[in-house]
Swiss-Prot record:
Assembly: Homohexamer.
Annotated TM spans: none
Gene that encodes the chain: coaD
Assigned EC number: 2.7.7.3
Lineage: Bacteria, Pseudomonadati, Pseudomonadota, Gammaproteobacteria, Enterobacterales
Binding site for substrate: T10, K42, M74, R88
Recorded metabolic or biological pathway in which this protein acts: Cofactor biosynthesis; coenzyme A biosynthesis; CoA from (R)-pantothenate: step 4/5
Similarity section: Belongs to the bacterial CoaD family.
Protein name: Phosphopantetheine adenylyltransferase
Amino acid sequence: MTSKAIYPGTFDPMTNGHLDLVTRASLMFDHVILAIAASPSKKPLFSLDERVALATQVTSHLDNVEVLGFSELMAHFAAHQNANILVRGLRAVSDFEYELQLANMNRHLMPTLESVFLMPSEEWSFISSSLVKEVARHGGDIAPFLPDVVTQALMAKLAAA
């Protein structure tokens, strides 16, 4: 039996913390879907197509990782992909309560869907996409926190705004 996991998120933009988690998930599971949520309510800076393209570039060295966009409920997406594992990152205790609620709701909607929580490597434990965007907007150096192609795309996007 092969294992298929989904690592969902908005990834606006994808950070080195995200890359750390998807890389580690790719070592744990036979197939990993990096599922990029449309998330229009979050008003993403990058379009869904842009986020999918960037994530595809960033993960191209991971042979068992597939990048897909989605706009449906996660449990429905997981069922359509024949996946029964969700990979989620926990940066801090403050993430746990929200993630617990999500895991319980997903299990209610799809009883065979299990959530697996990974802690980021220490060097990425304080990074979030929103924090990186805020630092970039104020002229801070974001290069250490993002893959190079994402840094270039973010700087170009902010310059065009």
